[in-house]
């Protein structure tokens, strides 16, 4: 297995160029980007960045929701030996000043007008920020600030540079070593200024591969990427493990469509903080309160059985034959439809982290056949301890 993220990308592109790598929902329709297409896009962005002046060891800020071209931008920076720095898209402009000054960031690729406005505001305190590119041009037609341009322009410049220097991209990827810095993540800064945590290709790939082996992840898995890319947990599940395993990462249309998109995609590998699992359970209980008496009675009986033997079944412990038959009937009538309603019909492995999850909540999901596990980790340990 290649030992750097750009190396992993090129390996997938060579072995399975037509396999889906990323999907993005746009105007209600899922658009697919294959590994071959992704490699071509990364090559163009990388060549555009070097033509713009990004050098090995310099930092590139990436801000936005989970978007294929932002993922490609991170890969492009890594291919050049530069260091992507994802920052939280919901942060105020003032919150960007410290990390961007601390990392001496001179280049930024952002999602849309909201993030462009923040970068222009930040420039007063971070004069080294020379170039800003944006993915979504809506609302930005009349912006004429120096150094501001659409990502499409960067890609076009990169293609021209690549045509003049055809061996450049491959040579840069070959220079990148496992011990080189792959990304910098900033902590929340609850006790002071945020701390920049540096991870190499080696550390991130090692943690991602270890988790993939433990959970038996393969290229056939599907992930829904909806948490902030600046959080290292999201980066591990939807970036590092994605490149290690070669599975498909699905990017929702917006935060408001995540629940719908979850049901449409039916991910096999899922991560969410406890509040998401709590919200889903609350919605189920509210719906059952409005259900008819017979349906409520069936649900209560089935859940009583599930709480009694479901966790044992999930842990592989034996249960009685009669209880097993009852559970199978409950799965047919209650548990499987419930998993489908939640969007968990295909989930093999589900994780939660960030805070402790209540035992009742934990028991509920494992009782109905969802392999939910508590994850302990930190930014410094690349999620997994």
PLM features: what roles do these ranges have?
Residues 46, 59, 65-85, 89-93, ...:
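A short helix-loop-beta submotif of the ANL/AMP-binding
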């Amino acid at each position: 297995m290649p030992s750097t993220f750009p190396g992993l990308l090129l390996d997938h592109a060579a072995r399975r160029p037509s396999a889906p790598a990323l999907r993005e929902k746009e105007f209600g329709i899922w658009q697919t980007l294959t590994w071959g297409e992704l490699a071509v896009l990364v090559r163009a962005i990388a060549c555009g960045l070097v033509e713009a002046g990004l050098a090995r060891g310099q930092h590139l800020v990436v801000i936005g929701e989970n978007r294929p071209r932002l993922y490609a931008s991170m890969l492009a920076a890594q291919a050049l030996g530069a260091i992507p720095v994802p920052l939280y898209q919901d942060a105020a402009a003032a919150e960007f000043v410290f990390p961007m000054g601390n990392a001496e960031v001179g280049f930024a690729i952002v999602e849309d007008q909201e993030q462009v406005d923040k970068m222009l505001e930040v420039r007063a305190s971070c004069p080294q920020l020379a170039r800003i590119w944006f993915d979504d041009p809506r609302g930005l037609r009349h912006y004429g600030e120096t150094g501001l341009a659409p990502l499409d322009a960067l890609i076009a410049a990169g293609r021209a540079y690549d045509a003049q220097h055809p061996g450049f991209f491959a040579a840069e990827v070959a220079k990148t070593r496992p011990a080189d810095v792959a990304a910098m993540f900033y902590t929340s800064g609850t006790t002071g200024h945020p701390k920049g945590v540096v991870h190499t290709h080696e550390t991130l790939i090692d943690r991602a591969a270890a988790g993939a082996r433990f959970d038996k992840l393969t290229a056939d898995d599907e992930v829904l990427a909806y948490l902030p890319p600046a959080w290292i947990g999201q980066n591990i599940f939807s970036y590092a493990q994605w490149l290690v395993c070669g599975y498909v990462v699905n990017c929702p249309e917006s935060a408001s469509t995540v629940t719908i998109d979850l049901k449409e995609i039916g991910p096999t590998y899922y991560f969410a903080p406890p509040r998401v699992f709590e919200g889903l359970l609350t919605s189920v209980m509210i719906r059952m309160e409005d259900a008819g008496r017979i349906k409520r009675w069936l649900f209560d009986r089935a859940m009583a059985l599930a709480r009694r033997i479901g966790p044992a079944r999930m842990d592989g412990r034996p249960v009685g034959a009669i209880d097993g038959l009852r559970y199978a009937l409950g799965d047919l009538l209650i548990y499987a439809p419930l998993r489908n309603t939640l969007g968990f019909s295909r989930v093999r492995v589900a994780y939660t982290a960030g805070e402790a999850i209540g035992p009742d909540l934990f028991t509920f999901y494992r009782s109905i056949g969802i392999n939910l596990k508590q994850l302990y980790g930190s930014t410094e340990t690349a999620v997994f301890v």
